[in-house]
């Protein structure tokens, strides 16, 4: 998958055409889901693809923002065994499926839900796993202009490049407000990120979707170590924060592995004290 191009053109869709996904494309999405990368390899995941008539009426009132279910021709139900970091893994896996669908011209959207047991009961699922995600899939009613010609990491960034990338991330926090260097609050500038080949990975991670578009992630660069912290606030719950963290890790990893090196996220806190505020929690780190 071309993560750079796919992320640049991805956006959540909540209004779908009454049109099923063609069989060839649906099979490609299902095949990808069976073998897609995981954040934690030894967590067993089961992904059920179900159609409108098997899901919408059953979950209306029980899933979706304030119980208003999103109408879509298809849904992916993510089930997972319960292990350490299984929710972050669900965010990573589920968003990977969304990106693959987008690459194939299929739109998607994460759907909120309150309780795994209720979803399992309403959908009559036979499983020993927990529902960790619901994703709508289909063709969006509104077309969106495609962005092409993403800039490669390590190149010389012109003013036109910067404007193009800035426009693609409109509505997002400025990168320097999201990436710190050496210590918390010390903003990383574009030149430093570019020299370290980290501008693109950070910029694309900045575009990751998040609950209520909170953009809760902050990255701290300490030499070759990248630390990811996520803000805890009253507007969201722990599940949403962990899903958001998993998605951000996927975006960063997808870009940096295409342009610089392979990485391995180490989940959990770090030993060193960086002066991180108490409302932020370190969720992972990696070496580049």
Language-model segments: residues:
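Acidic, surface-exposed loops and disordered segments
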Residues: 1-288
